[in-house]
Structure formats: C-alpha cells, structure tokens
A protein has these predicted regions:
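Conserved acidic residues
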Residues: 33, 169, 224
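Active-site beta-strand-loop-beta-strand hairpin of nuclease catalytic cores
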Residues: 171-187
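A structural signal for short, well-ordered beta-strand segments
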Residues: 49, 93, 170, 226-228
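A short, glycine/Asx- and small/polar-enriched loop/turn
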Residues: 44-46, 164-168, 174-176
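RNase H-like, Mg2+-dependent phosphodiesterase core
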Residues: 1-154, 259
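A generic structural motif
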Residues: 52, 173, 231-233
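Short, low-complexity, polybasic intrinsically disordered segments
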Residues: 230-259
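Catalytic cores of nucleic-acid endonucleases
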Residues: 158-159, 163, 184-241
Length: 259
C-alpha cells in the first residue's frame, strides 16, 4: 500500500501506516492465514496478527517486505526528482540529510513535503511568494505530474528551464503507452470567464507537430496519447481536469474527460 503526504498530514504517521497496511492486505488475491507485523499490534481487523519487534532482523518475510518497500520508495523519489530537481531527491531519497534541509530553506518546501512536519512548517511557500517569483505555471506542471504519479504514470520528462521539452509540459508512460501532457494553470479568482475552453486548434496543431517530431527523433513506435489538462488553483485543494485525446496518424481522434 502507498499513502501520500496529504493523508499523513491528515491522519498522522501511525494511522497512515495502518492504512497502507490495510491497502496492501486488501490487494492480496489470497486471504493470508496470519499477518506478520514489524512492531506493535496494528489497527488491522479480520486477520490474525503476529507482532515482532525489530521484525526485519528476525523474520525473512518482514525483511523481504522491507526491501520491497524501500525499493518502491526509492523509485518514487527518483520520479519526484524529475519534477523537483532542485531538492536532489534522487540522491538523498527524501531523508532528512543536511543537503535536504538546506534546499528546503533555500527553495521553500515542495508540494510533496509533509506540512505537519515541524521543520517544514517554517518554510512553506505562500501564494504571494509563488506569484512574486513567477512560479505559478511551474507549480501547475509539478502538481499535475504528481497527480500522474499517483495514478500510475512513470514520469519521463517535465518542462522546466533545463528541459528540452517545449510544446509539451510532461512526457510520461502509462500502461505501455507514451503520454504527452499539456498543462494550463488557471488562477480561479482571476479568470472566472471561459475557464472551461479547450486549447485552440492552432495550438493543438503546434503540439501535434512537436509530438510528431519527438516520436521521429526518438524512433518510437506504439500507442500515444495527448492529455490536455487544466489545473485550477484557488482556495482549497487544486482541481484537476484531464481531457484524453488519442493520437492516430498525427491527428486527434477522440476527446474524453477521464479524470
């Protein structure tokens, strides 16, 4: 099971851990006879438990699960490193190293940092800070990329000052298909009219030309999709809409709002 930073902030780390355990058990195709818990008794009902303090040192099953958990987490942090390269997640994997804390002080916390964690609370960016430093569009791309990770995408590229991606903001892979995502970040209180309008035809053609050249340059083959996305920033949590467009013979064949 995977529990993200917002759920940890809402529930606390212990309850979030229990939730991840329940998610993992719920995905099993066979009901286990017993659940081995590394530590004290967990809030898991309907299953017999065996609690083992320092279980990763005493149980091969728990040790193997710990390795899988660490490898999975490290892979996620490498994905987040593409989205937030300034924090060096690929190097320290999000742990509380000196370098990590220095970057938080210098850059302000990112959306994936736990807001309830005391060192983070002193370095949360305000909307005024984001606007003053011209980070609104970048934040929109980052939030959309984080959303794609949560629903199972592998992030390949994200458009920032150092990326070669131009017309497309995010390139990802999902269920074997290459996904090109265009992100439109909207501040709700400043654009109340026509906020539902889609990207115009000229821009779509320019985007398709970019995708066609990218596919040719990379000598890619297979299925491709274009996500035209909108992320609305305002009071409360961001609102995300993604319009899924299949690409066939360099033309848009289908439009479907899928998130």
């Amino acid at each position: 099971g995977i529990v993200h930073e917002d759920e940890i902030d809402n529930k606390n780390i212990l309850q979030a851990t229990y939730l991840a355990m329940r998610q993992a058990i719920g995905k099993l195709s066979i009901k286990p006879d017993i659940v081995l818990i590394d530590g004290n008794k967990a809030d898991i009902k309907h299953y017999k438990q065996k609690n083992i303090i320092n279980g990763d040192q005493k149980s091969l099953s728990i040790a193997a699960a710990s390795i899988i958990a660490k490898v999975t987490r490290d892979q996620m942090m490498r994905q987040y490193d593409i989205i937030f390269p300034e924090f060096g997640f690929a190097k320290h994997k999000g742990y509380g190293t000196k370098q990590h804390f220095e970057e938080i002080k210098n850059q302000k916390a990112s959306p994936i940092h736990r807001k309830s964690f005391n060192p983070i609370q002193n370095h949360l960016p305000t909307f005024a800070y984001i606007k003053r430093n011209h980070l609104i569009n970048r934040l929109g791309k980052q939030l959309l990329a984080c959303h794609l990770i949560r629903i199972g995408h592998e992030i390949l590229e994200l458009d920032d000052d150092n990326s070669q991606v131009k017309e497309i903001d995010i390139i990802s892979r999902y269920k074997g298909e290459l996904i090109f995502t265009n992100v439109d970040t909207i501040i709700v209180e400043y654009r109340r009219k026509n906020i539902e309008s889609l990207t115009d035809v000229l821009e779509e053609n320019r985007i398709l030309d970019f995708i066609d050249n990218y596919i040719a340059d990379q000598a890619l083959d297979g299925k491709f999709q274009l996500y035209m996305s909108k992320i609305y920033l305002g009071k409360g949590n961001p609102k995300i809409k993604i319009f899924n467009k299949s690409i066939v013979n360099n033309s848009i064949k289908k439009l479907e709002e899928n998130y």
